[in-house]
Structures are given as structure tokens and as C-alpha cells.
Swiss-Prot record:
The protein, known as: Large ribosomal subunit protein uL1
Assigned protein family: Belongs to the universal ribosomal protein uL1 family.
CDD domains per UniProt: Ribosomal_L1
CC annotations in GO: cytosolic large ribosomal subunit
GO biological process: regulation of translation; translation
Database matches in Pfam families: Ribosomal_L1
Keyword Protease: no
Subunit relationships: Part of the 50S ribosomal subunit.
Primary role: Binds directly to 23S rRNA. The L1 stalk is quite mobile in the ribosome, and is involved in E site tRNA release. Protein L1 is also a translational repressor protein, it controls the translation of the L11 operon by binding to its mRNA.
InterPro entries: Ribosom_uL1_bac-type (IPR005878), Ribosomal_uL1 (IPR002143), Ribosomal_uL1-like (IPR023674), Ribosomal_uL1/biogenesis (IPR028364), Ribosomal_uL1_3-a/b-sand (IPR016095), Ribosomal_uL1_CS (IPR023673)
GO molecular function annotation: rRNA binding; structural constituent of ribosome; tRNA binding
HAMAP family in the cross-refs: Ribosomal_uL1_B
Keyword line: Repressor, Ribonucleoprotein, Ribosomal protein, RNA-binding, rRNA-binding, Translation regulation, tRNA-binding
Amino acid sequence: MAKLSKRLQAFASKVDRQKLYAIEEALSLVKECASAKFDESIDVAVQLGIDAKKSDQVVRGSVVLPAGTGKSVRVAVFAQGEKAEQARAAGAEIVGMEDLAEQVKAGNLNFDVVIASPDTMRVVGTLGQILGPRGLMPNPKVGTVTPDVATAVKNAKAGQVQFRVDKAGIIHATIGRASFEPTALRSNLNALVEALQKAKPATSKGVYLRKIALSSTMGVGVRVDQATLAAQ
């Protein structure tokens, strides 16, 4: 394991890795650690009480964070005709069909989110090996395959984040930047937790949200007392 910097060592000494911190204190600690020369992301890891190996317990979805992500998002949309015009009007940077597919095949992936109208999947479907590994393949489960491309574009621009449980049963997501006010980070975290609760598989038994931990890009994890999340 790589040695921690003196800054991280000093911060780590303040954090009890076994303690559950009230959300206010957890956010304060995480923001205190985010002292790098750039505006660090504030990330969350949620351990779910599911069996990720079972297909009926895969947790996946999306949520629009009320305070946004602090990131400028470039959106590409596969659409034609009226839907293409709607996508452009909603703010999509790139809109196309076969021409856009050719750009993707050529390696021109200068976008962060890909949205597709259902009638374009015959074209988009051929791009799975390129878009899939990068987490860019449109999927109806996260709202990126939809006839309402305009709303999907607006959601992406407004701070929508996608989530999917990994093989260890953990959800990883970014809920903002270190420059955000604690109230903004808290509202974003609450929105994510609510979305995860709605996405709970019917076959999941026992405690569903097992652990929640916050960290900054260059920081260490701080565990959150879930009982303090709902309280305002």
C-alpha cells in the first residue's frame, strides 16, 4: 500500500474508521481534507445488502441531483427528424445518426453522456463494444433510451448521475464538489439514497443500506450514521 502524504496522514489521524459520524460532521471532515489544488469531487460509496451475482438483484438507475454535480456535461444524442431538433433545442452538443456512429467508430468520443431515441437503436446497437466499456451505452433503465430526448438532455445537463452496483455489492457515485455548501452536498446525498431505496430489489433480504461512506478525491473515507440523514 502506498504511503499516505503528510497531509493525508494528519487528516486520517482525525478520523475513526470504525465510528459512524453524523452527516454534518462527516461532511465537515471530508471538506476539510479536500485541500488539493483543484476542486475535488465528493464521492460516496454505499454497501448494499444484495447478492450482486444474482441477476434479479442488480441495482441500477439514475437520479437528478438537486444541487447538480458541479461538472459541465457534453451530451450526444442519436435522433432524427423532430426529435433531433428537440435534442438540439434542449442543449445537446452533438446530434446525429449514421454520421454520429461513424464519429464514434473513429474514436471521436468528445462527450460525457449518450442518449438515444428508441428508433435509433439499430444504429446505436452496433456501437456496444465501443460505448459499453466506457459506461456510455444508452440504456432504458437509466433513462438514456427514451422517446423524450429533450427531457433526457435537460436531466443530464441538470446533474443527473447514473449508478450501478459493482461485483462487491457497492454503489459508487459523485455527489458534488468540495466547493459545494454542506447543505447542497447533503441534499444530493439524500436524493441518491432515496433513489437507491426505490431501486431495492424485491428479492433483497435483511438490511439493504448497510454502510455509507464519504470521501474526497484525494481523501480517506468517513462513515456516515444513516439515522442522521433524514433529520434536517
